[in-house]
């Protein structure tokens, strides 16, 4: 087991070449988690350390936005974007029990870490995701036209509270990185128009980046979906790295050239993960290892890359496929 060294991930996020390959996932569950536990890991920190990560991904507190989603579906694994809205008009907005991030429990950030390891504090979903959870996707799209002031007020309440959540998390010495996780796109378009994204969503992400940088810590974006029409916005928000890539949108190899570019270190945004989930789950271990090694080789002189899945390793991914991916870091 290699020793954790968070400075290697910092080099990646600074778009430099790390001293050795770096691994990255939004979080670990399913086969990756189970494999580590079966081999002696006793807690979440052990899982990340045993598998070769330099950080532990955690939700920093019990803060969130209560909704009806999941309350009547038992163990359902999927849900509609229009499922169980709780804010439908001004009256339900005024009655909603908005939680105070400062009144929540941040004790997950007090956990003991091995030398060289830090926490990555991710959110309880993001600005757009929580607005959709509270209102419903179709309802939100209609609200932007029928009652734009109410829509603006909802985004204000969600965004300002998430910013405070990250501000509190960033104060902890154990936190080395803030992760703003917020899905923005379908396969061929953004979930809202780019103009509406710029008006309601992006300013809060820019504020989260500012909070991270003011605390001397990098900020990373996890956002699934199409992003070609908002590429300049991504750069303007100032994120140090981006996570989540799909082959049917833009393969990680092409994304790396787009975000890092050139032939030297110092591109615009580090690329994290990117092994497409369909590829990861359905290819042979040999094919996965070959593509993983090729991606590391592509970044070997320019840096700014950490190896991992395109999103997160799902329950149905064969464990040997996951191991074939991460084993690439140990090969010349």
List the model feature ranges, each with a label:
Residues 1-43, 76-79, 92-332:
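Active-site loop segments of alpha/beta catalytic cores
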Residues 70-72:
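An N-terminal assembly and electron-transfer interface module characteristic of large anaerobic redox
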Residues 41-62, 168-173:
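Catalytic domains of carbohydrate-active enzymes, especially glycoside hydrolases
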Residues 52-57, 82-93:
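N-terminal substrate-binding region of glycoside hydrolase catalytic domains
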